[in-house]
């Protein structure tokens, strides 16, 4: 059965759509309502589709170049493409070693010619070739041990801010700032050898048995209870007498060495200078840590532990001072039957009520002509004498280098290297203690010592700072050792002369030289005359309890020459009770020269000398 469809003009109607014509652009004239609230999402046909700021995507492995050069398109993880491995294409690969032609064998072995004959088994060649195959981790660890960095991401922690040796007060006026690059260029050549004015004290002879001490034949360090006098310049009775007839600049060898070697120092220190008329008196403050020996001051990573830690900078300095005092006395031939070398005058710091035994130290008062009317008078020290096979007498300066923890200090194991590679041990000490060794050398040169003898002292146990052993000794001539450590005495004299000239141009008063704790420079301050005297007046009645004690476990009552109060340490600090400047100056001026008091403050002593 069929049905016939009639096609008439009324059954099909075509309505043409309404077209919009945009005369000003290419897009539609208006946005339809169906697409009005849909957010716009850009895309590129060459990239995977993604969203703007899609933080839910997987993080890139290398953050260094993250979102730096990549496109923003295709960041969405929902559009990510994951490739599925097709195991049908897996096949074995022949990993057999390919035999190289004869002319290519040994092509990348390196130069082995210079590594032959370095011991049995050619150990030198193995070490030389292995150095070129260090991995990145090995290089990184080596750089960290050396304290160096190669990448910006491996920056070392910022250096620790050090404290100043004395707090700068608001009423101090800065006169001069001298940076180390300028000071290192100074020079004062042709300074003649010092001329002896007076010699005092008694010395013991060095025991040559300690020259045979080595790592296998070590000797324990003994505690020698003797008194060491650390008298400052204006408390020295000999200098007070010489200031009337000799020179116009007065100091001690330790003060001069600190100034001359200031360009090598990193820690803060200070020296008080007093100008009265045409005379300069260089002093150290009482009850300070000026006489303590620094440890690893110039190392790449100096000790930075705080508090009462065993390896804190202050405890290490106290330990080094304790070792030096005991070592310098243990290596001598001591005893009532042993002969001693006596100078013309006796030790000027031994009082009538001296109870303990005084250390073997002799004092040599010398003067130097620095030209332009500057004559320096200083007190220098000798530690011992040595009788040569020819019968000559040589004066010695004895010092000790101490090992505390080679792993923490990035140093060399003394017990492994000292007997076979002593030069490497000394070179490591020159890097870590450049300032201390330079000051010892300057002191030996100023005193005119014939030899400077170093002792290598290590802890018996790395975690015990109270027991030590002597591992060996080594001696040098001061001039030769100065050349080895690149110490220029012309530059040292130039630095001293520069500071003296600056102070001589100032008005009469008290000044302070301080090493900046965090910058390579020293500053000269103009300070009031009574700056460091108030503390001494408050502590006048209790010197026994307030005196500086270098080492806590070596307490022994010992009287000092300048202060009758007992100081329970082997290092007797000659700290005298401070008096009012006007009263002390008037008292000194009213008394005869031979009755002048010996216990006055630096200001009082200098003022009294100038008035007379």
UniProtKB/Swiss-Prot annotation:
Keywords recorded for this protein, A-Z: Cytoplasm, Initiation factor, Protein biosynthesis, RNA-binding
Ranges of biased composition (kind: Basic residues): 100-121
Signal peptide from the UniProt entry: none
Positions of the UniProt region annotated as Disordered: 97-162, 584-612
GO cellular component, one term: eukaryotic translation initiation factor 3 complex
Pfam families hit by this protein: eIF-3_zeta
Gene Ontology terms, MF aspect: mRNA cap binding; translation initiation factor activity
Segments of skewed composition (Gly residues): 122-131
Transmembrane segments: none
GO terms (BP aspect): cap-dependent translational initiation; formation of cytoplasmic translation initiation complex
RNA gate, as annotated region: 289-303
Chief subcellular location: cytoplasm
Compartments where located: Cytoplasm
Domain comment, as recorded: The RNA gate region regulates mRNA cap recognition to prevent promiscuous mRNA-binding before assembly of eif3d into the full eukaryotic translation initiation factor 3 (eIF-3) complex.
UniProt family annotation: Belongs to the eIF-3 subunit D family.
Function: mRNA cap-binding component of the eukaryotic translation initiation factor 3 (eIF-3) complex, which is involved in protein synthesis of a specialized repertoire of mRNAs and, together with other initiation factors, stimulates binding of mRNA and methionyl-tRNAi to the 40S ribosome. The eIF-3 complex specifically targets and initiates translation of a subset of mRNAs involved in cell proliferation. In the eIF-3 complex, eif3d specifically recognizes and binds the 7-methylguanosine cap of a subset of mRNAs.
Assembly notes: Component of the eukaryotic translation initiation factor 3 (eIF-3) complex.
Database matches in PANTHER family: EUKARYOTIC TRANSLATION INITIATION FACTOR 3 SUBUNIT 7, EUKARYOTIC TRANSLATION INITIATION FACTOR 3 SUBUNIT D
Name this protein carries in UniProt: Eukaryotic translation initiation factor 3 subunit D
Organism from which the protein derives: Culex quinquefasciatus (Southern house mosquito)
Lineage per the UniProt record: Eukaryota, Metazoa, Ecdysozoa, Arthropoda, Hexapoda
Gene coding for it: eIF3-S7
């Amino acid at each position: 059965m069929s049905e016939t469809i009639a096609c008439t003009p009324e059954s099909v109607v075509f309505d043409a759509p309404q077209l919009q014509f945009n005369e000003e652009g290419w897009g539609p004239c208006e946005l339809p309502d169906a697409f009005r609230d849909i957010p716009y999402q850009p895309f590129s046909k060459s990239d995977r589709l993604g969203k703007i700021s899609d933080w839910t995507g997987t993080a890139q492995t290398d953050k260094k170049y993250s979102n730096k050069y990549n496109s923003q398109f295709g960041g969405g993880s929902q559009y990510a493409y994951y490739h599925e491995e097709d195991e049908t294409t897996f096949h074995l690969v022949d990993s057999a070693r390919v035999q190289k032609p004869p002319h290519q064998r040994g092509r990348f072995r390196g130069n082995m010619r210079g590594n032959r004959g370095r011991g049995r088994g050619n150990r030198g060649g193995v070490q030389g070739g292995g150095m070129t195959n260090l991995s990145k981790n090995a290089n990184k660890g080596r750089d960290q041990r050396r304290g160096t960095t190669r990448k910006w991401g491996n920056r070392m922690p910022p250096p620790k801010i050090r404290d100043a040796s004395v707090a700068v007060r608001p009423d101090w006026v800065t006169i001069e700032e001298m940076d180390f690059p300028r000071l290192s260029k100074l020079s004062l050549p042709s300074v003649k050898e010092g001329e002896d004015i007076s010699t005092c004290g008694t010395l013991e002879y060095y025991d040559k048995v300690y020259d045979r001490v080595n790592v296998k034949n070590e000797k324990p360090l003994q505690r020698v209870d003797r008194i060491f006098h650390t008298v400052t310049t204006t408390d020295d009775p000999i200098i007070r007498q010489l200031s009337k007839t000799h020179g116009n600049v007065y100091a001690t060898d330790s003060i001069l060495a600190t100034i001359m070697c200031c360009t090598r120092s990193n820690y803060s220190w200070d020296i008080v200078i007093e100008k009265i008329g045409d005379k300069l008196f260089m002093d150290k403050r009482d009850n300070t840590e000026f006489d303590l020996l620094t440890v690893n001051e110039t190392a790449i990573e100096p000790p930075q532990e705080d508090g009462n830690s065993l390896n804190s900078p202050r405890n290490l300095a106290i330990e080094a001072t304790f070792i030096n005092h005991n070592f310098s006395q243990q290596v001598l031939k001591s005893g009532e039957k042993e002969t001693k070398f006596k100078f013309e005058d006796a030790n000027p710091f031994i009082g009538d009520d001296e109870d303990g035994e005084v250390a073997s130290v002799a004092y040599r008062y010398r003067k130097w002509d620095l030209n332009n009317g500057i004559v320096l008078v200083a007190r220098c020290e000798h530690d011992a004498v040595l009788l040569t096979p020819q019968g000559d007498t040589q004066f010695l300066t004895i010092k000790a280098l101490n090992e505390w923890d080679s792993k923490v200090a990035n140093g060399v194991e003394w017990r492994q290297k000292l007997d076979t590679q002593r030069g490497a041990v000394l070179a490591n000490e020159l890097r870590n203690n450049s300032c201390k060794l330079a000051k010892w050398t300057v002191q030996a040169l100023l005193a005119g010592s014939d030899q400077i003898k170093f002792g290598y002292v290590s802890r018996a146990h790395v975690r015990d700072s109270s027991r030590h052993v002597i591992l060996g000794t080594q001696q040098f001539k001061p001039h030769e050792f100065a050349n080895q450590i690149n110490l220029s005495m012309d530059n040292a004299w130039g630095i001293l002369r520069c500071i003296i000239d600056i102070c001589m141009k100032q008005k009469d008063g008290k000044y302070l030289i301080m090493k900046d704790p965090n910058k390579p420079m020293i500053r000269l301050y103009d300070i009031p005359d009574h700056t460091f005297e108030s503390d001494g007046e408050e502590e006048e009645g209790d010197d026994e309890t307030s005196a500086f004690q270098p080492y806590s476990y070596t307490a022994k009552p010992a009287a000092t020459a300048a202060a009758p109060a007992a100081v329970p340490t082997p290092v007797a600090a000659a700290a005298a009770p401070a008096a009012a400047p006007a009263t002390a100056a008037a008292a000194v001026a009213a008394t005869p020269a031979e009755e002048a008091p010996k216990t006055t403050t630096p200001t009082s002593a200098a003022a009294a000398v100038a008035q007379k």
